[in-house]
């Protein structure tokens, strides 16, 4: 927990969001992960046309400086700012709205009609249900609606 009693991710999100907006960036998310012996605090940003090194560096400088002030002994070893990647996760309602018509892969916690992974064109998130038209696998061409509570993850689908 951070000093204020908030989770570190929430604190960083509140701190970074206005700076990201001022730079014309969208704050996609914040995560604290352990990889091997190290803990990484990662801030993910995006913008129309994609982000570049200069965007990441600009946000990193201002947020890292503020974190140094409020967290003299940070609970992480490395701070990173980056793009969410081509296969970016869809977490917020705004993410689902932004990527309507795009190909996505949705994974459920438990099998639905015998499967846990669905690839299709995102139709939207309406009334707590993720709707997609399947483009691969069992049920190809069908439109399905999954309760958002069933969804373990949703990501943009990358084709090579």
From Swiss-Prot:
List where the protein spans the membrane. Answer: none
Quote the CDD domains the UniProt record gives. Answer: YlxS_C
Q: Which GO terms describe its cellular component?
A: cytosol
Q: Which UniProt keywords apply?
A: Cytoplasm, Ribosome biogenesis
**Pfam hit, one:** RimP_N
What InterPro entries does the annotation carry?
A: Ribosome_maturation_RimP (IPR003728), RimP_C (IPR028998), RimP_C_sf (IPR036847), RimP_N (IPR028989), RimP_N_sf (IPR035956)
* Any single GO BP term: ribosomal small subunit assembly
Location of this chain's protein in the cell? Cytoplasm
Signal peptide from the UniProt entry: none
List S-S links within the chain.
none
| PANTHER family with a match to the protein in the record | RIBOSOME MATURATION FACTOR RIMP
UniProt record similarity statement: Belongs to the RimP family.
Tell me which HAMAP family the record gives: RimP
| Function, in words | Required for maturation of 30S ribosomal subunits.
Query: What is the protein's given name?
Result: Ribosome maturation factor RimP
> Which species?
Symbiobacterium thermophilum (strain DSM 24528 / JCM 14929 / IAM 14863 / T)
